[in-house]
Amino acid sequence: MLVKTALFVTLIGLAQAGPLPAKSSGSEDTYDSHPQYSFNYDVQDPETGDVKSQSESRDGDVVHGQYSVNDADGYRRTVDYTADDVRGFNAVVRREPLSSAAVVVKPQATAVVPKVQLKPLKKLPALKPLSQASAVVHRSFAPVVHHAPVTHVVHHAAPAHSFVSHHVPVLKTTVHHAHHPHAISYVF
């Protein structure tokens, strides 16, 4: 019964779906063997002082263009450029002073002397010790050393009929007891 139900649901789904739409031929990109374009823009912002412009045109593989910008030092930089397959990219740069260029004035140094009113110092009496205290004496005592007898800890394992073997190096150490002042140590 489950197989019949699954087959019925599948047939209804196929009937509702319908055929796939055919590819539309209008959305294909075409290759332009001789591209042509031309654009330009101009920015004049008196609030920030940003003044620049650019224009460019292309005819096939040859591009001609120009851009200019007003630099902060009072000059306009203009770049004329050409790019093609034969000569590559070529640019000619010109710098021309702006007509409204500001005259830079050399700064003059002025001496500023602060007026300081000095008051005479008050003479205070010298400090006298309140009492003659004895000098502080530091004494060192012999260090306290704790002695304990040397004990050797030996662990014995009961014999086993079967064991798990691990292939790792065995660390064997000899236990020594050293006398250290003011230290507590445990040797296992």
Curated annotation (Swiss-Prot):
Pfam families: Chitin_bind_4 (PF00379). One of its GO terms (biological process) is chitin-based cuticle development. The keyword Signal applies. Residues 19-67 are annotated as: Disordered. The keyword Signal applies. Residues 24-41 have a biased composition (Polar residues). One of its GO terms (molecular function) is structural constituent of pupal chitin-based cuticle. Component of the cuticle of the pupa of fruit fly. This is Pupal cuticle protein Edg-84A. It comes from Drosophila melanogaster (Fruit fly).
